[in-house]
Amino acid sequence: MPDKFKRVHVVVMDSVGIGEAPDAAKFGDFDVDTFGHIAKHVGGLKMPEMGKLGLSNIREIDGIKKAEKPLAYYTKMQEASNGKDTMTGHWEIMGLYIDTPFRVFPDGFPDDLINQIEEKTGRKVIGNKPASGTEIMAELGEEHVKTGALIVYTSADSVLQIAAHEDVVPLEELYEICEFCRKITLDDPYMLGRIIARPFVGEPGAFVRTPNRHDYALKPFKPTVMDALKDGGKDVIAIGKISDIFDGEGVTESIRTKSNMDGMDQFIAVLDKDFNGMSFLNLVDFDALFGHRRDPQGYADALVDFDGRLVEVMEKLTDDDLLIITADHGNDPTYSGTDHTREFVPLLVYSPRFKNGGSELELRKTFADLGATVADNFEVKMPEYGTSFLKDLK
């Protein structure tokens, strides 16, 4: 393909897996299938835009017709890295291979870590267990407001979260506490992927989170394709939690979002900008609101809503644009527990330039093939891992 694309748009539907990976059992996952099981649960998904692109051509999804002439190139990608969390998935998409998984704490954090937090802050720690943020806020929020104790909790991910009422622990103090936690959990025995500040406001029984969440991630251990793009003078516009996932590395502009639909609004606004490089959008609600909470109906509704916004996206794309839709792991809301699931992820690659539509690409054996393709397009340093499929897009 002679001309390169001026803009590449990578959209990550957080946790929207498309069927059990070959090594799923190693991760404790059996018969998991995020997309497939959601579709079955609701008696078929209505996602005509994704259908036209070729979603059911990857493998049939109840309710979504297989496209006779798919508009996009399509396949699925298999994760190579040793993990099934957000950071591992995104870092691999941008060209890294993660051998040592981030640590998880399904029984809460060790006393040693909790003691360090209490000594440093002069505040007691309450909670210290895996929990949904909204539930633990409802359960312990009143005690926190009365005592000033910090609500510390985790999830199925490698994460330490601290929830605090903005009138009890001022934002600046909460951020300082999280920065301290970040410093002491960079290496073994903790090796945590993220520390998250989770401020909230309101009265007992009606606490609500504020948009002042802040993530303190580990920096990627090697440069990613994003760094290569930035170093090559290209734009890297991070939308949603992308900047947090990469701790700002390789990002030239960061746009925060409040929800999937706000994320789509921001993305559509970015499409109106004149830039040369990559936009990178994460839609986290699929995972945070519906996957972990095991809510297949809510998840289905969110997928349908996303599909509805693709009409606006497609209208704004020109022959200079390449749109890549994928995911970072699975999170089957019909499965037991609350953890992510080890799955293949969909890959749909579209440009109005493809006048004859798309066709099937080879199965990708690492998410890094996506990053390699972006690097290849912009003629910047190729990642150590990944094989570009740019030449297959005709």
UniProtKB/Swiss-Prot annotation:
Q: Which residue ranges does UniProt annotate as crossing the membrane?
A: none
Task: Write down the EC number.
Answer: 5.4.2.7
Q: Where is this chain's protein located in or outside the cell? A: Cytoplasm
Q: May I have one GO cellular component term?
A: cytosol
Q: Would you kindly state one Gene Ontology biological process term found in this protein's UniProt entry?
A: 5-phosphoribose 1-diphosphate biosynthetic process
State what protein this is by name: Phosphopentomutase
Q: Which GO terms describe its molecular function?
A: magnesium ion binding; manganese ion binding; phosphopentomutase activity
Q: From which organism does this entry originate?
A: Listeria monocytogenes serotype 4b (strain CLIP80459)
- Amino-acid positions noted as binding Mn(2+) 2 in the UniProt annotation, renumbered to this chain: 287, 292, 340
Q: Which residues form a coiled coil?
A: none
Binding annotation for Mn(2+) 1: 14, 328-329
Query: What InterPro entries does the database record attribute to this sequence?
Result: Alkaline_phosphatase_core_sf (IPR017850), DeoB (IPR010045), Metalloenzyme (IPR006124), Phosphopentomutase_DeoB_cap_sf (IPR024052)
- Highest classification ranks of the organism: Bacteria, Bacillati, Bacillota, Bacilli, Bacillales
Q: Mind telling me which SUPFAM superfamilies this protein's record contains? A: Alkaline phosphatase-like, DeoB insert domain-like
